[in-house]
Amino acid sequence: MKKKEKITIIFLVVSLMTALVLIALLVLKKPDKSGSGKKADTSPTVKTTADAETTSDTEKTTDNEKETTTETPTTAEEETTENPDMLRDNKYNQIAINAKENGQKIVYLTFDDGSGTLTPTVLDTLDKYGVKATFFVVAEYSPSKDFAKDQYNAILAKDHTLGIHSYTHSRANIYQSLDAFKEDIDSIYNYVYELTGFKPYVSRFPGGSSTSFADERMKTEYIPYVKSKGLIYYDWNVSSGDGNGSITSEQVYNNVINGVRNKDVSVVLMHDGSGHEATVEALPRILDTLINEMNCVILPITQSTTPVQADF
């Protein structure tokens, strides 16, 4: 073989090898779209100061949100919504405050010894005049337990105040000892709760706190026991006189109106038990005079009402 031909062959071989190398390099450098050939990054993650601050702020925000959720204070509106007694108390207390500021007389009408056969008529009359009152009930003076249940719940449903007076109203027995007194008060309290699910908070002693049946034990024994049950007791400073069975409706009317004229705040004693027809007859006229002639504000007793109590 001639020398020139050898050189040509060598040149072709070198060129071919060079071409193969270039092709191989191109294939190796071509990106792997599937990522399967990408080397995993096993280097440790380094959190920069900025990253750390951002993370910290995020964590703080999350913590703050948690604290806000768990520590949100109960608003006054939520409290009154949860406690309807408080809402009612505030309502009538504000009316009393406004009445005093306006120079109006305040009258609390109270009815003892129900619920009896006259109670439904009394409730209807109060409804007619848009008036709320207070009822101090006696268990044994109701015609039946079912009747008592209906009337007690009607009193509450109509937004009157339901208080306790006595289970038997037998003063000679009730005041003979502290144990006898406790039995009577506990019995009427539990009776009202059984029939209504309502826990009374106001009471009136049979005969009032100045009754001669109790003597000095009223102050030393009976009043402390009533207070220990969370009860507020109320006497009266105006009497209708309807405890006298021979009284007329005219006399009831005059006793109430004349008594109220002399006071800025009156707690009026009346009765809705059987035998007090004169009171039922006088009631519409009493309400008409108190509201339309004397511009009185008539309210039910609440826990904010200043008690009228006998001096000892």
Please name every model-derived segment.
Residues 17-27:
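Hydrophobic alpha-helical membrane-insertion segments, chiefly the h-region
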Residues 1-16:
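N-terminal Sec-pathway targeting helices
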Residues 29-104:
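N-terminal, intrinsically disordered, polar/charged segments of Gram-positive cell-envelope systems
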Residues 169-269, 273-292, 297, 304-312:
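Catalytic domains of cell-wall/extracellular-matrix polysaccharide-remodeling enzymes
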